[in-house]
Amino acid sequence: YERTGKIAFEVGAFTNIGEDHISPIEHPTLEDYFASKLKIFSQRRFAVVNLDMDKVDRVLEAASRCERTVTFSLTDERADVLALAIRNGDCGVVATVRTPRFTRDIVIPTPVKFNVSNALAAIACAEALGISEEGIVHGFEGVFVPGRMELYPSVSGKILGIVDFAHN
């Protein structure tokens, strides 16, 4: 569990916790996995935390040793980075995002809500690092992750295939 033990990160982001890595070859229990994930905050300067996840109080406690914590959420008004509105657009999802420095629409070129949460995490990381508003917006232009919610409509448009295997 010390795969990144010698790396000093500027930002450590904790997006969620689930049972997807519980197995004989990874983590034997959810608690073991959770404790392992919390270690990221001992190797970082800034913490980014999703207020929408389970066990958020424990995550915030672990993040408190960081120089600064930036939070994000799809729904929690207390978040530093918040999606005020989410709607479908021509090129993906359009989220009206509020940060400590700006409020504006950002096009997220992936078609599902959980990717909005991932985008908010990226925006929170950029916020922690002081990246400009334009730099953040520009960073989403042309984003494409192979194998992550790739849509393949049939010629008729009546059938939609979805490829989504890029979990980790």
Tell where the protein language model's regions lie, with residue ranges.
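Acidic, Mg2+-coordinating active-site environments of NTP-dependent enzymes
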Residues: E2-G161
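Short, glycine-rich nucleotide/cofactor-binding loops
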Residues: G161-N168
